[in-house]
Amino acid sequence: THFMMGGDSVGFWADVLINAMGNITIDNVGVSDLILTKYFRNSFLATKVAFFNQVYDLCQATGADYETVAKHIGNDTRIGHSHTTITDERGFGGHCLPKDTSALIKTAQKHNTQLSILEEAINYNNTLRKDTN
């Protein structure tokens, strides 16, 4: 198991985790690195959800079986099966994915950096979520 930690109390919390869990790896990184890592992980997963919703749309349009197509895409270990389930609500929701994708976009804008792929995933997701409400 691998953990990232940052801040002034890393030593204390690393000891607590090692005592509780045994053989683990802990990286002591800067707080900015921790925050961006969380935002990017959740943004990647949100983008993956949006992508697989488009896979679903094309399967519906062509008569292909989404479950079969998604299964075989996910069998590629570089892709995996997480975040490929199509829900009745469609797209990504919940608390973390919308919040973190929005925060990452705002951070990028503040630093004059484009995240156009993520922006498109959010726009597509907003369209999906509107259509099902």
Please provide the spans of the model-predicted regions:
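Internal alpha-helical scaffold of NAD(P)-dependent oxidoreductase catalytic cores
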Residues: 1-81, 107-114, 120, 124
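A short glycine/serine-rich beta->alpha loop
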Residues: 88-92
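NAD(P)-dependent dehydrogenase/reductase Rossmann-like domain
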Residues: 119, 124-133
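Terminal amphipathic helices with adjacent charged low-complexity linkers/tails
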Residues: 86-87, 100
